[in-house]
């Protein structure tokens, strides 16, 4: 008990120290930014920025009306040029605060490592060992497991690589500062930080031109270079070490694998095609081979083990003979010589697979390329086995073990690129292929049973529909061209280069069969459909995107064997927008997030938190169904059934500016309409966040709970008890309420009303805003009732403090955004407006730390 108390006391001191450093770092970064602004912009604008920040902070601390008036007067008196400077200052300050908070999160994580808690990977691994789970069960779970973060690009991506690079440097300097003790060290660190902050201020935050798909590919690769290539092998190796007493001599399978939609996601993006897919896979492979070659070069320097000191396996001696380096000075260093030969062969592999990769080959190099990643792994494993057998176990962990894990995980492809297209595009392509193949009917006009019959019959035919001698539309050539590119990339870089074909808007079985038929046209489906020898290269993955389609999904999934199904311990999830930079720009933060993801997946499989007995579960699910139906009715009534709601949305949010002002390669909507149904989910949510309503995150819950409790007064008390029991004992419901609590903490109806005035139709504006305000009150009351407090995020004080600290600097940006959007829509043509509006979008997204 004394040890536990001592550990707890030590952790409390460490956490207090981390909080002190957070405050000091934020103050320091603010001072450095002020200095950078003063040097570049001069005293006048520097004073205005300081006055605005102080007035905003004073208003939020005291809610003083005079402070509010002072702030409004300061903002109203800004010229457009000064507005740009103020927005940049507020936005960059929040960027810097985010860096300090990320470091604080890392330090808290370090404090907790000695006392593992639920949700941490160390805690989960400890539970696995203490639970006495049979080794075979653990082994089979890990062999079947798949945890795959999938990086995506979206219309709301607002970060520039140049800015991310500088911020990464600032984060590194802040982290180094924490370990410094001498005044000289701290002074030098401060000078370096000042240089980085000044560089940040003098760097353009936003791009002049629209982001291309190639830009998005290159941006994503920076996270592999900084984080994934290093962190994922480390995690896998450390898990293997932690479980060594449970799974002795068992090599941990590479269950943590990266995915990407960038370069392969065609749904609504006309700029993605076979060429972008090839370039995505190619650039990934170049990044990967450069990493492998760098690691091998480092190993050659490090493993100068001499046979004059220790023994070595004969297999390593044989490998050493493949080296071009036969210097007399290194004849007793077989590991180094063997690695030299492996390096040459890997370089030959890179040059074969990527002839335009800029590889430098020695004139006397005559090494054969490796055919597969497994062929590369074999000699490295031979070296590891020899080291292990000859007192060299400690030499494996620092680099060789991680390189082996990296190759087993990343292969020759780095990340699996998914391809995605909408089901209506597939239908159009199949219709044209059938017509050009001589079928005198309109496939698109048939009912579902007729379509299934035609598709199954075609899948049994040995001939292809597509003919090189026929003329097709650009759409057909593009879609077939993408699948041909898939086949080429798989043949060159292995089957993991492209594995999934995702179908947006899946509604029926024919949507899946159409993709099977298209795969056949490109050589990705072989054999006779329905027979034992059928081979389908790409998993056909449906996306069910409406309530009705989700309810019909079991019928579709049950009929189609090629559909990808995920069992226990498997999850693929998309990471997009600012979430990628928030989670993965820093390798320490990236590791913490990946460990949390692994822990959650293993916990859900081995130690499910939901231990409800069946009767109680059915009762809870019945209540949830009732709440869901009422919430959906309320939400749809507002969004889809209220006359003028689309006009309200398009006028009172920055959705049009997001679509126009260079925020990504992908259009914000699938079609050029002003229909809610045609919007993408991410811009929809992003736009509501910008105007501080975050409506999709909470609207409908209040009505659902209010109706559930008030429907029958005689049952109100019992129903409330049921909801409180669900909140206390059902993780699903608890998480739902906690998430809504967080969204409400970021919502501000006073700010949102400013945006509402962008709509000139006063009657429509008041009608819709009043409905939103009424539902907001119902939802706030419901969450307060279930959580037993009126304080937002009472159980998450760190997040609550972070949000509270952001609001003073967020409100002025919202105010300025409304003003500039109004001027832009009124026809002002000053280029500074087009420059300033995206700055506010970036600053607000950065402050909210989400993009929808």
Please state what every model-predicted region is.
Residues 2-456, 473-475, 569-852:
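Often metal-dependent polyanion-binding catalytic scaffolds in large enzymes
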Residues 344, 348-355, 416-417, 422-513, ...:
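Active-site cores of enzymes that catalyze phosphoryl transfer or operate on phosphate-rich substrates
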Residues 233, 261, 499-500, 541:
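Structural motif
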Residues 532-537:
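A conserved P-loop NTPase coupling/switch region
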Residues 515, 540-543, 552-553, 596, ...:
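Extended, hydrophobic alpha-helical segments in both membrane/secreted and soluble proteins
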